[in-house]
Each structure stands twice: as structure tokens, then as C-alpha cells.
Amino acid sequence: MHYKTKNNKFIITAFILLISIALTDKATAQIFGGLQNPLGVNWRQINTSGFQIIYPVEMESEAQRMANNIRYIFPKVGRSLNVRKTTIPIVFQNQGVIANGFVQLGPKKSEFNTTPPQQFDSQDWLNNLAVHELRHAAQFDKLTNGRAYPFPEQVYFAWMGISIPLWFFEGDAVSNETSLTHAGRGRQPNWIMPYRTALLQGKNLSYSKANFGSQKDVAPGYYQIGYLMASQIRQAAGKFVFDSVLTDIKDRPVRIYPFAKSLKKYSGKNGKDWYEYTSAKVKADWEKQAELSPAKDYPVLNQEAKYATDYSLPVKMTDGKILVLKQSKAMPAAFVLIDQDKREQRIQGIGQQEQPWFSYANNLIVWDEVRLDPRFQQRSYSVICTYNLQTRKLNKLSSKSRIFSPTLSADGSKIVAVQIDFSNKVQLIVMDAANGKIIRTYPNPENLLIQTPSFNNDGSVITYVSVKEAGKALWTVDASGKTTKLINETPQQLSRPIFLGANIAFNAHYNGINNIYSIDVNSKKISALSASKYGAFNPSVIKGTDSILFNNYNLFGYEIAQTKIEEQKPGKDNFVFFGAAAEKQENTGNVFDNIPDSSFTSTPYHKLGHLINIHSLIPVIEDEYKGGLQFNSNNLLNTFDAYAGVNYQRDLGRFEYNAGASFKSLYPIFNLTYSNRPRRTFYATGAGTRQGDWRENYVRLQAVVPINLSAQNHNYNFSVNAGTSYTQRYDTQNLPANFVTAIHFPLETGFTFTHTTRTAERDIAPKWAQIVRFSYYSQPFDKQLSGDLFAVAGFLYFPGLAKNHSFLANFNYQEATGIRTYNNDINTVYGYNNIMAKSRLKNTLLFNYRFPLFYPDAELGPLAYIRNVRGGVFCHYENVGTDSNLSQPKTYGFELHGNMNLLRYQPNVDLGTRFVFVNKEYHHNPIFELIVNYTF
């Protein structure tokens, strides 16, 4: 048997990407040189106290406000790390509708996605981002000795990813946002609810599972675990414990697991020990809370879940069926009808949402859905869609809109929703449900952030939640525009109010657990309608009864429950606040109180004047024979990337010099690369085989137009590319007289079309997908080197025999002439490079069937955490019709893969083996391959 190892090209950015995951406000990684804004965005800047705030002109008012806030709060944000000042650019991104924020190095910057979400904390959105992301800036400054530009930034970033676990970065930042304000995620029961539920139900999660997640169970994640651990560590070891830990890591940077060792030095325990201590401590505290909080058991109206599954926003239909938005580890989001026997019928899949949301009335479903700009994907939209259950007609009511939380009137004729423009101006609007026309806009003179509105039964009154720095409030507005505040600003997590006759039901956590409450609009008396053990959400009225449907949280997610409307006292607040010690240590109150109101000079930010931003010198390893150093430059707006470097080719004993740039401001992306490189060839002569060497200058220009579209659960991608190059060879040694010294402008063209359906976490591949790819290479300007290559590839993905199985049929064809006769531009059979070919490669037909085997969630000490194990079989044909037929594949066999985290690092490593059996006509032994890939 032959042994072969297959590896990805390794570059130090593997660890750079690792840590970028840690420092996004959601678990979504920032990809360097990633998304762009449209060319027409007009940028300005404010420079104050080390902060360079770069923002679109529409955000002038918010930029002035945040310039005051950021420079005032940073000394308090960094105080427990002994970091008093910083230098960092902050880019305000206002073109998108996905709420997020991050800090990075390489280049050093922070980005705030300024459009506020419809459900988050009980404070101003940009303030919430600032107090969290600035803590990351302080962490970085502590680790880089406070250097404004810590060159080489990507090396520092990679070192941080290797040295420090993600739970610290995010847990410390969440602890900070919680202790410095009246809000913060540490004060939200629903944020920590999955972990509380698991512990109280006797589900003890391993350290790795809690941090890295599961494809089987609901796992809390490193934000939540990190907050709890950081809180316990600060309580035990004091306010400045992390200052000491990070200083020790900075002073002794080259060690194995430096964070664990430094943490043990200053707190007495390493990370895993602190996790076990914290789990036991919070479990005991939550058990006491459960004893003090009377709770009810509610019958479950959906099928018993075997893995993490959410049945969100249940609504009872007139025929007794229940409509929900279902999503699970094995199923992407879709509307589902559930009958009285708990049988499920899938109705319609949907696309990405900022949060799960829909409304139903009179056979009509309405929801909002995120759509990305086809080219400039920093810009996204929130569009309104409807689906008629009777006619099965799908309709998109708005295009290129920024409309959120649509809710139908009882007769299904009107939609109330929230609209937010590029300046963060918020409006409550009413739309015609038939055509999407805005028929009314309500005044919002204070520009409160409005969330989750809904109509009363006759459509004459609307209720909604507002958010500002002081907290959340509950309101009504009538047909005349008169507003009434029913609940004053509070840190309670008020959300999704609906009318119950003359009263209003809503979600809050008055007893320390998220439950459903109601308020009498006349007396303003608040009563409890549910008494859930872990959390109750999303009430809906069952017409003609005195009951409501709602989501009751349990071990595997959001279940469907029902209860009678019986008003009870809200009960005592028994919430367990684990951040109390850190809050007392900081002793700041709300850092956003008493902010100065200064006015700052605003100047244009010229994109062309800021294209070059050299931030790093990194090692690059291409393979076992070639490696070197590379300077990297990325501008702050992700529109221009450049690099220059040198590699040493060990097998040739010579250096190679490279440079390149990518310009991404326009609809096409232009890529220019240059290389001065050594080359070697072997050629036959009458005296035998001889070796020839030369150097060459190689210049390549390419233009790519990537177009991405989406609609419901379907995604479409079109990509057109064209390129050419010029090669000039010199310093020739031992080469024949007819050796070509110049290659003039060969043309490369290609087109790719991709259609995929939305996938679930367990899906190995899309259930349905089609890919067609064409490429053509020619030599129109160089007659002495004539030769063409045309290639086409088609990929068809189908569902397998069981859930999450995948079958792929891939057909490839190429026709090559002239100097390209022996070139290859198509996928080959497994084992191709090890097997002697019968003839030139013209086509391949590749069948692959892949399937999950089990989900062990197995922690092998500190070595590995195995998330899933998958199998696959394959049958591959080459040159069908000449060298093989459908009964005689060239290769066939099976493979086994495991998805895991190694050494407690974040990248998902796919480690696998493949056994390739070769058709007996080739007289070749079986081939064994070891496969190593990674994703982030």
C-alpha cells in the first residue's frame, strides 16, 4: 500500500483568523480584505484622543456623539488592565442591517455595525458596542505594550490566538460591559439560560464542549462560559488579576500554554480548573434560585426533540394546527405546521434573519429577511416577505429596504414595522399587506429605538418597546398619534408585546427568569402569566379561548406550550448576578452618565489617500521546499490589499521575489501580481536527459466580477473572470536553442454559476445544489506558442438516503491542444497522481456519497475534542467511453473523517483517512491517504 499525506497550504493567517473569531461581537469571523461598501459612500473622519472615527456622512450626528462617549469612557474601560489611553481607528459601517462589532490587528482597527438590532440589551446600541469593543482594544494594548502600531500586527494577532483562549477575550469584555453600565449581557437571564438549563437538568458539559459547541446539544459557548469564569476569577483574585496575567504573558511570550500557567500563578487555578470550580459554584447558586422561584410544568405540544431544536413563535390556527418557525441542528429554518398528533408538515423555507421572526393572520405569514447586495456585501437589506397558506403564493413586499419586525393586523390587511435609515433615524411605519406601500409613518421626535410593534384586535392601537441609554420602556400609540408610556425605562428585557384584549402581554424577567407578563393599560398593574423553570417567550392568543401559546425553554431548545390566562403576582426577583464583585471593584456606576457634549472638527476621509497601510511582516510557508517573508498592507475600508515578499526555494537554492495588489472599490475586482522567480526544467536530448535553469519576470492581471443573490432559502452566485499575463525569461543556462524566452499575453477566461439551498449545521453539503463552471485558455497573441484549453465542470448535489446525507455527481470535461495538450484543469479521480494513466485526461465522472455516523462530543483530555465522525464512499471514472465504462471505475473506496478541535484551539480540524482501490487493469496496489483540512 502507498502512503500519501494531503495538507492545506499553511500560512500564519490560520491563527490570525482564529483570533478574529474571538473578537467579533457575534460568532462570525472577520475575513481580512473582506467586504466592501458601494463606491458612492461619502466618508468623513473625526480625530480625538487617539481615536480616528471614520464614518459615512449620514452618521455625522452619531459620530459626534460617540466621539464624546468613546474618549470619555476609555480610561474607565481599561482601568482594571492599567491601560489609560489607546490609538485605534474605528470604522462606522451603516450600510448593513446585521448588528455586529469587532476589533482586530492586521490592520489595527475596530468596526461598529451601526444599525441597531430588534432584540438586544436595555441600553443604546452604539454605547453597548463601545463599552465591549473598547475592552478588546485595551486587551490588545496590554499585550502589545501600548504601542499605537504594534508592527508586525498579524504576528501579534497570531501569537494572541495561540497563547490565550477565546473565553478570556470575550468573557472579560462581557464582564466589563456588565460592570460599567446598568445593562450588559451578564444581567440577562435569557443570555445564560442554556447553561443554567443544562446544569439544572444534570447535564454536565465538558470544558471543550462548553467552549466549542456541539452538533447534538445546546452548548453555552465561550462568551457565556468566559463571563462566568472571568467573574469568579475576579471575585477570588481581585480587580487587577487579568492585568497581572496579561503582563506575565507579555513579559514571557514564548511558552506552551502561557495563559494557563500565568492564570494559575496569579489566581491559583488554570483554565480547566476554573471551569470546573465555576460550574459547581453557579450550579449551586442556580439550584438555590430554583428553590426560591415557584415554577410550573407545561405539556409539550411538539415532538420530543433528540437534538437541539427550536420551535419558535407558535401560533394556533383555526383548524387547530400550530404554525411555527422551526430550526434545528439537522434542519435549516422553515415554517412548519404541527397537527394535534404532533405530526409536522414543512411549508416554506426562509433565508437569513437577524433574529427569528414572523407574524400570522388570516392565512398570511409575514417575516423579514436579510438580503445582501449582489456585489458590495458590506451593504445588506432587510426585506419584507409574505406567504399565503391558501394560495401558496410567495411575495416580496419590499426591495432594498431596511424594515424590521413586521407584524400583521388581525384581518391581515396591514403590517406595522420598524424602519431605520442610514443615519439611524427610526420610524414606526404601517404598510399595506397587499403591495408593501407605506401608508402611515408615526412621529418619533426623540428618535427612540423602536422594537417589535404589534396591533390591537381592531388595528386602532399599536404597542411597542423603546430603547435608550436609560433602559427599555413599553408604549402604545393610537390612531390619532397619541403616545402613552405604560412602563418607564427599566433594565428589564422587555420584548415582543402583544394585545390580550385590553391588556398587553410581553416578555420580561421580573422574577429573575424570563417569563410572560401582562399589564393593565388603565391601572398599569403588572401580572405574571407564566412560571417557567428556565424561560418563557413569544406569547400568542388562541382565539376564542382564555389561553395563550408560548415558547417554553427546555434542554434541547424552545418548545411549544400552552397555558390559561391566569394573572399571578410577578414574584420576587431572585436573579443570580455573578458580576457583582466586578461591579463593586469598578465602582463607576453607568460610565455613560455625565458625558461631555463637545463638538469635534470633521474632515473628509479620502479613500485614495489611504490605500497603503503596511502593518505586518509575516512568515509564509508554501510547501516543504519554499518559504519566506512577506509584507502585508490592507487599507481600513477593505478596498485595497497589497503584499511584497521574498521566498527561498530550497530545492533550487535561489530566491524568489513577489508582489501583488487587489483593488476592490469597483464592480470588478482587479488583481495584479508580479514575481521574479527561478525556474528549472528537464528535457530530452540525443545524449539523454538534461537540466535547464533560468529566471523569469512574470506579471499577471486579472479582473473578477462576483455576483451573489439570495431569495428565501436559495442562494445564487455568478462569477465572471478574465485575465492575462506576460512572462520574460532571462539568465538561461543549459537550455536548447529553441527555448522560448517570452510568453505574450495568454488569455484566461471563466464563468461559474452556483445555486445552493440553505444548509443546517449537520449537513455535510447542501441538500440541493448545482454548479456549472466554464474556463478557456488561449494564446491569441503568440502564434509560436499556439494552443487552447477548454474545460467545463458540473456538480449536482442531491439528498441522500437519510437526513443530512449527501450525494454528489460531478462531471468534468476538457479539450486541450498545442502547448496546453498535457495541461489539466478539471477534477481528477482520487489517487490520480499515483496511478499511471492510459491516455491524456479528457473527462472524469465522480460519484461521492457522504454521511454522518455519530456525534460523540468526546473530550480526549487537552489533546482533542471530537465533534462528529463521518463516512463516505466513492466511485470515480476517467475518460468515460474510452478508458472506462460505468461497470469499470478507475478508482473506488471509502473514507472516514472526524471534525475536531485540537489542543483546545478554535479552528475546526477535519482529520480523515481515505482508502482508494484501483481497477485491476492498472495493476496498482490500494492507496491510503491521510487528509488534514481546517475551517474557522
PLM features: residue spans?
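Outer-membrane beta-barrel initiation region
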Residues: E287, K326, A508, E559, ...
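C-terminal outer-membrane beta-barrel translocator/porin domains of Gram-negative envelope proteins
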Residues: A687-T689, A737-V869, G881, V932
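Residues that define the transmembrane beta-barrel architecture of outer-membrane proteins
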Residues: D623-G627, G653-Y657, D693-V699, Y716, ...
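Juxtacatalytic substrate-recognition/specificity segment
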Residues: A29-W159, P165
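Beta/coil-rich, acidic/histidine-enriched accessory regions frequently appended to metallopeptidases
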Residues: L35-Q36, N42-Q45, V245-T247, D251-W357, ...
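Outer-membrane beta-barrel translocator/channel fold
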Residues: P374, K533, F537, L555-G557, ...
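A flexible loop/linker signature enriched in serine peptidases of the S9 family
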Residues: G186, Y307, K326-F335, G349-E354, ...
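Acidic/His/Gly-enriched intrinsically disordered linker/tail segments
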Residues: G33, P107, D124-L129, A137, ...
